[in-house]
Amino acid sequence: MRVCGFSSGSQVASFVVGHGQHPDHTLFREGWVLLRPLRSRLVDGVVEVDVEVRRRRPQDPAPAARSVHHEEPGSAETPVVHQRVGAYAIVVSPWGVLGTVNSSLTRAPGTWALPGGGLDAGEDPADGARREVFEETGQHIQLGDLVSVQSDHWIGRSVTGVLEDFHALRLIHAATCQTPSQPVLHDLGGSTERADWVPVEMWRQRRWTRPAFEALSQHLERIAGQSCWK
């Protein structure tokens, strides 16, 4: 994945995100502070993400350090290095906000997450978000702005049992569903056990994964407030 930084309409930074590198850290080292994501797209088979930045100031604190959590620190097995770019959506409708429940194959079974997942090779992020939402929930969505870019790095087991040195890059979009229905899981046997609509005012009563909770805390109120159902 490539990140392109823009300030006052001009591109001022561009880099490919290496394995385990966090975009906000890289920008800070290059003299920029990440303000917000702008858009994502596919260019010559590579996912590109544009972000708005500003010049770093002497008083700006560095982004918080993030350690690499190892779920099996005593293992002699060599983990497989895997960086995955995924597309996700905060989907709102008259029925609430759309969530999925993690299956027993995941690191956090029973927790709630945002619908979405890894992009296929050569897939545009917007197309991937729509595909993943349909596969996990059966809902057809209208995709809006890119609202968050998340980066996490850990060592643990995949749903297939492989020990991975895993770097997750998540592109989270706002979305609406004009014709909500009872969610149906089409992608069986994977990381998602089921899906459901959660009333917006009750979303904090569910146990969400940390990435999902952070995204919802930062963006759900605004996304729901801008919908035609509020």
Task: Specify the residue positions occupied by each region the protein language model found.
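Acidic pyrophosphate-coordinating catalytic loop
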Residues: 42-48, 78-82, 150-170
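The catalytic Nudix box helix
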Residues: 19-35, 114-147
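Charged phosphate-binding loop/patch that engages nucleotide di/tri-phosphates or the phosphate backbone
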Residues: 214-230
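N-terminal strand-loop-strand
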Residues: 1-14, 73-113, 141-145, 177
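Intrinsically disordered, low-complexity, charged terminal extensions of DNA damage-control enzymes
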Residues: 1-47
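Short, well-ordered beta-strand micro-motif
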Residues: 52, 91, 172-176, 196-199
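Phosphate/ribose-recognition catalytic cores of enzymes acting on nucleotide-derived substrates
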Residues: 166-181
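Acidic, metal-coordinating catalytic segment for phosphate/diphosphate chemistry
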Residues: 39-90
